């Protein structure tokens, strides 16, 4: 065979190889495109909206914020109906333990959530907010109370009961400050403490900073040292939810950017933060004590999501 003919055959063979490679590459690209399209279609299908009823058991201090988050969630999921039971955290755990049905549990401290976890009533918990205590008095501060000291002598002070998260925090705070209180009443819900001060039935009450904000111009707020006493708020899906998909949607909303912004507006601190406070609402009395709790301003609202963390099951 001549050199010219061998060269021609070699050239033809090379062209055939290149042609096959090109076809293979085209087929591969086509396959990749199809897979990508299928993945896109699958992702789109996975974005289905939650429907049905979701029952949320939540600490009383969360009422305003959670009801606002509810509106956004239901607007985004037209077929979803969220209902709440706002009570003291210990009562919520007892309700679950007694067999009452619910999809989500949100408590005002880790110790009550731990009780639920120990009884296998909930799944994984996620911390979504923090809160600290403050002192409130009726508008105008008629008793001229200045803090947790002698100015409370003879005053009708109302606190939360020791078994309630705000009462547990109050006990820790007074122990840290070396202060002895003599409340005339101990309530099962922090909102009941606030209500008695708003109505003038009590001269002073120890509540969360978020409750002081919720009271708006009905009370004056007297800042007190928090002494590192911070309540950490965890949320969890119950162990036997009737609407797991709906529960997940609500929990994601609470821990997500929008929910965290709402919580910050209501005075809650970011998850894991050492301080929390009200950005609006009750005014601080001029006679307030030194070392006040830091307020959570609207400028913080973009940061809580970055600080989101899974709650430890030990008490704060």
Predicted segments — roles?
Residues 1-21:
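Sec-dependent bacterial lipoprotein signal peptides
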Residues 2, 16, 24-62, 67-71, ...:
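Exported/periplasmic ABC-transporter solute-binding proteins
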Residues 77-84:
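A generic structural motif
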Residues 79, 101-102, 202:
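Short, high-confidence coil segments that cap the C-terminus of an alpha-helix
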Residues 86-93, 101-116, 122:
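Ligand-binding clamshell of periplasmic/extracellular solute-binding protein-like
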Residues 132:
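PIN/NYN-family metal-dependent endoribonuclease catalytic core
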